[in-house]
């Protein structure tokens, strides 16, 4: 498959092993896993960080295989979800850091272009989340207010 902003093929990467059932060696107690997810979320970890902690420290290679639900779904069920989805928040943070870099390095043309591409991704993602009702209907990405939104 081609890359998003380049007209060439991507590079190969590792693939997660195909499994339909939980490995015998893993921790597969559903209540314990869900409780750990809620506890880690209340401690301030993102869903991606929760997955890494469960994999590395608690022997849960795949939460969806063990519980039948994704980490995000478990977080939403317990009303611990943030107002801005995690992937959108990460892209907005990336764009904000690029803007701060460009304030000091105005002639950095490569970064200017990368900022345009990143903000285009943000706008596409906002359009998707407004359509799926994860964001309110009139929600629009504005670079001026992004820092205030991310500080919450």
Curated annotation (Swiss-Prot):
Record GO cellular component, one term: cytosolic small ribosomal subunit
Keyword Endoplasmic reticulum applies: no
Gene3D superfamilies: 4.10.860.130, S15/NS1, RNA-binding (1.10.287.10)
GO terms of molecular function: small ribosomal subunit rRNA binding; structural constituent of ribosome
Example of a GO biological process term: translation
SUPFAM superfamilies for this protein: S15/NS1 RNA-binding domain
Any matching Pfam family: Ribosomal_S15
InterPro entries xref list: Ribosomal_uS15 (IPR000589), Ribosomal_uS15_arc_euk (IPR023029), Ribosomal_uS15_N (IPR012606), uS15_NS1_RNA-bd_sf (IPR009068)
Record carries keyword Ribosomal protein: yes
Xref: PROSITE patterns: RIBOSOMAL_S15 (PS00362)
Domain of life: Archaea
Record's keyword terms, sorted: Ribonucleoprotein, Ribosomal protein
Quaternary structure and partners: Part of the 30S ribosomal subunit.
PANTHER family (UniProt xref): RIBOSOMAL PROTEIN S15P/S13E, SMALL RIBOSOMAL SUBUNIT PROTEIN US15
Similarity remark: Belongs to the universal ribosomal protein uS15 family.
Full protein name: Small ribosomal subunit protein uS15
Organism per entry: Methanocorpusculum labreanum (strain ATCC 43576 / DSM 4855 / Z)
